[in-house]
Amino acid sequence: MRQPTFAALSLLLVAPSLVAAVPHDSTSTSTSTSTRSPSYDPDSTAAHDTTTPHTPPSPWRRLSEAIIRRIGSLPHENHLQKSMLALATGPSSRAPGKQWVAHYGGDVVLRFKMQTADEARALSQAAATLFLDVWEFNEDWADIRLAKDVLPSLLGLLPRSLHASYEPLMQDAALVQAIFDTYPSSSASPSHNTNRFSPNLRPSPHHANGHPFFQDYQPLSVIDPWMSLMSSMFTTHVRKINIGISYEGRDIPALRVGVHPTNKDEPTKPRKTVLITAGLHAREWISTSTVNYLAWSVINAYGKDREITHLLEKFDFVFVPTLNPDGYVYTWETDRLWRKNRQPTSLRFCHGIDLDRSFPYQWNGDQMGSNPCSESFAGDAPFEGVESQRFADWARNETESNNVEFVGLLDLHSYSQQILYPYSYSCHDEPPSLEDLEELGLGLAKAIRISRKGHTYKVTSACEGNVAFANKEKTVLPRIESSGGSALDFFYHELRVKYSYQIKLRDTGNYGFLLPKEEIIPTGEEMLDAVLYLGRFMLGEVGWARRRSRSRWSAPDRGTGDFDEAEQVAIEL
């Protein structure tokens, strides 16, 4: 890989000293945020609106944007002329060339609508038999990508009732163009593709504005130095950490954001921490960009926004933009639609393990079949996926050795606009804190929908969000693919993270994993509203803390095994 230029590295190295010489708004943090204003309204949208459209950007903001533009202009890897990024950024035209057509031109994405158990079972078996790429599925439909010349074979395995129950979502030139457009273009202006429209995607006024880092999807070679920059520029409340090492030897970087108490006379309680993760599935780029947007928004708002400042004083937030760095790099260099990690399997020509099927809780890779060529291959044993085990080991070490208590998990994925709570492995077993999970989930969905005119997200269990139902009584139809061994269930059940959610971001299928880059900021904005609502909920400003808890949940055993007073005796208004 070509390395960053000396000038760029020098800029990164001197950035902290340059920033130190710039007057910061956060210098007044210790006095201005220690006491919350009497007029503070935790439910007010304006309370966390940090935008000031008529105010010139501060010097540190201009400096950070200049550095980020420099990072973003660095050359990327193009070994053996196989880099997909080089193909996207090389030509001045925004039309895909022959290489793109040869790679994806024969594919089609079809949406099947199932009504009966026989139809669901037949589609599930056919997808497994033909090694098809199942993009998404829920109670209404299943989206499957396949080569067009495989379609006759697929229909031959399906009942006749399904022969007329599918429709193409993307095919031929449209699919190739959608893939091509997700890569950045060195020649395109920020307003590129302003006329793109989908019935499920409202045109956004934000696509040509805002931070330059979020005008495009970014490769890992840009994300990593950007994270280092954030840590260097905001030393009071940001620290870059390493979750672990991937199979191919890459770091799994994260940003820990929070302000720790300085009073050493009082015993230090376990630091309540919220995990916000993305990228378990490599091709879900919007999840990675959204985590970066959330981190940037929270980091920049500290000392300026009362609500976010208060949250960072009470909680740590750990932002992990990609838990699957090897797979993510592969989507930039070779195959945009790659899903799994990149470790070898028992079949030399079939690489990768589905990291979100590799966790040990209710792992069922042996029951679902062990086919390394499957997109949802769970490995031959629990934790065979290297990155899954590294993530779990890090989290356990945090709780056992570093005085951390994980109180929330938001694991971002795409697509289908759903907020999913445990369990994923079963539609029949109920989590002990079901009512609290449902209540908070509905609150998150409402915060997304109303605060910034966001989209509608469905709230349900992860199992019910990933199966089809035969009727209104929810007779569960056969699964399209396994949902055992998920990160969601593992963190909820094994690490006792009470508020654990998997959130599937925009859209509902018109673009699927190929969400236009113009939707990065709008998606980030609506998720920021969800994160702020989560914070209010955990602080007791909305939801469960206004009345007595109804759940059967038992807290992690940290000596006494009890909740603290605010949690154990909820306030009734």
UniProtKB/Swiss-Prot annotation:
Peptidase M14 domain residues: 216-538
Residues making up the signal peptide according to the UniProt record: 1-21
Chain residues that bind Zn(2+): 281, 284, 413
Names of the cofactor(s): Zn(2+)
Swiss-Prot/TrEMBL keywords: Cell wall biogenesis/degradation, Disulfide bond, Glycoprotein, Metal-binding, Secreted, Signal, Vacuole, Zinc
Residues annotated for substrate binding in this entry: 281-284, 339, 356-357, 414-415
Glycan attachment points: 397
InterPro entries according to UniProt: Peptidase_M14 (IPR000834)
UniProt GO molecular function: zinc ion binding
Residue stretch(es) of the prosequence: 22-186
A Pfam entry, by short name: Peptidase_M14
Paired cysteines (S-S): 350-373
Cofactor note: Binds 1 zinc ion per subunit.
GO biological process, one term: proteolysis
Any GO CC annotation of this UniProt entry: vacuole
Gene3D superfamilies registered for this protein in UniProt: Zn peptidases
Low complexity bias locations: 23-53
Localization annotation: Vacuole; Secreted
SUPFAM superfamilies: Zn-dependent exopeptidases (SSF53187)
Region ranges (Disordered): 23-60
Protein family: Belongs to the peptidase M14 family.
Name listed for the protein in its UniProt record: Inactive metallocarboxypeptidase ECM14
Gene that specifies this protein: ECM14
